[in-house]
């Protein structure tokens, strides 16, 4: 490649040198500009700037769809967790309940195998403790960050108690029809989630909901600063609080999980009315 403009375009994507199987789009207007595999073997993408606007609209749609489906999801999860046997549906529902309550990552087998980082489906029993009426999680998350989460949801506490009785090191396992112990996978949980919700959503959408809710709550408590710089600082502080909940960097949290409408509403001084309309979700 010798064309100076093309070289500048490729360099601007800042694809890490460690990525393998990297491919670039020949068309500078194509929505997907680059794709490659990270050290864990996962595909990573670089998109055109205009495509990011489309993704933001889709994020808003998925968030609204999840909020609408929440009552149905909660009823189905409660029904499946009402049993006393560690069935497949019981274990899958328990993972959904955990992520909905704590917003931890779903889990990736490659990351667990390569560097011992954990998410919901790859948690070990040693990462999960019952402390009175609470479930306490302690594990190393993506990026090596030490995470500690505590949840007092009665359904989850009861489910963890039942699942701990299943032989094996993994936390979320079940016995199949033949009595064989099997660990759940993130793909299985996502499929189960779509089945009970009746819509196309994923576990990641719960993290978007949590991040947006934290930012909404944080910004609804403050009056927008008079200067643009001051407002940016207020937004950053709110995003940092959400990033802590998600064990993410503020930059990733803002880009991938926080709904732009919340920030815009805050900057325009109408967040109090916006917050009132979604109170209770």
Segments (PLM) and residue ranges:
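Extended hydrophobic/aromatic segments used for targeting, binding, or gating
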Residues: 243-246, 264, 270-273
């Amino acid at each position: 490649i010798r064309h100076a403009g093309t070289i500048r375009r490729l360099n601007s994507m800042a694809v890490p040198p460690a990525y393998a199987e990297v491919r670039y789009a020949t068309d500078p207007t194509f929505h997907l500009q680059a794709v490659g595999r990270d050290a864990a073997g996962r595909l990573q993408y670089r998109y055109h700037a205009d495509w990011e606007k489309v993704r933001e609209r889709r994020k808003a749609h998925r968030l609204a769809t999840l909020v609408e489906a929440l009552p149905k999801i909660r009823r189905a999860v409660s029904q499946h967790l009402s049993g006393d046997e560690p069935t497949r549906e019981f274990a899958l529902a328990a993972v959904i309940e955990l992520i909905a309550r704590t917003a931890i990552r779903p889990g990736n087998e490659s990351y667990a195998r390569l560097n011992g980082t954990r998410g919901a489906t790859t948690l070990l029993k040693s990462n999960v403790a019952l402390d009175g009426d609470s479930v306490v999680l302690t594990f190393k998350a993506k990026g090596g960050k030490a995470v500690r989460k505590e949840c007092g949801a009665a359904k989850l506490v009861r489910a963890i108690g039942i699942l701990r009785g299943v032989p094996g090191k993994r936390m979320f396992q079940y016995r199949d029809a033949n009595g064989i112990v099997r660990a759940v996978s993130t793909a299985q949980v996502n499929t189960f989630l779509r089945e009970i919700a009746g819509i196309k959503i994923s576990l990641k959408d719960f993290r978007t909901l949590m991040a947006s809710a934290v930012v909404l709550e944080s910004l609804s408590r403050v009056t927008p600063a008079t200067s643009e710089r001051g407002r940016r600082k207020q937004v950053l502080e709110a995003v940092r609080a959400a990033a802590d909940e998600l064990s993410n960097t503020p930059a990733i949290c803002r880009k991938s999980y926080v709904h732009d409408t919340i920030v815009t509403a805050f900057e325009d001084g109408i967040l109090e009315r916006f917050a009132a309309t979604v109170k209770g979700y």
